[in-house]
Amino acid sequence: MSYKPPYTITPKITNLVAQISEAIGSYYAHENLRLHRVNRIKTIHGTLAIEGNTLSTEQVTAVLEGKPVVAPINEVQEVRNALKAYELLDMLDPCKVDDLLKAHATMESGLIDEIGCFRKGGAGVVSGETVIHYAPDAERVPFLVNDLFEWLRTTDEHPLIASCVFHYEFEFIHPFADGNGRTGRLWQTLILSRWRPIFKNLPIENIVYKYQKEYYKAIAVSGGKAGCTPFVEFVLGVIAETLTTQETTRKLSLIHI
């Protein structure tokens, strides 16, 4: 393996991995299947809202149920596409580039022309009207993506850490003309679901949306001497909070049974 993303395992990362691992065990013991659909709606709403989609959770629910929604056509299409993309989780291999392209084609169907293929022009990560990261030149993208996937296939790193590192490196490369954020978050969920399937039903994206400014700040401050360490710490914190929130939701649902 020739490429290794730069990052450092800090005490904060170690503690968060231990905390999440313990919480996952408890979550399995008390898993509430009735919350799966609600969580999928929260996931779709969160991952799209991060990038400006204005549909409410109620409208996302209506789209899921096939009901008419009064909203911009492209935003409704984004919801339909994201629902289809997350339904592919069981069929995608997190270590295959072709599956990444398939997921992107699903996520961006009917929205842009360049679906399921790497970008041909420049790109960057934008927060509001501010460009916080200029991506590598387009001609480098296939090689950078292949290096990243080779690292993912061969790394011995804990899946919690590996998924966060992949997420950051993916956003750094920004391989597509559009839909990089949505696809990157989907792929982290995919990686985590191969470690613990319950991650398919955890609305991590909804908590990322809650801390949207911090999410983009973590991307912006990563890449220096510490590599993507700040981003890894941030996302692990989001996962830990997601599990805490889910436990509270589970207890409340039991009260109302």
Regions found by a protein language model. Give the residues of each.
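FIC/Doc superfamily catalytic core
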Residues: 1-255
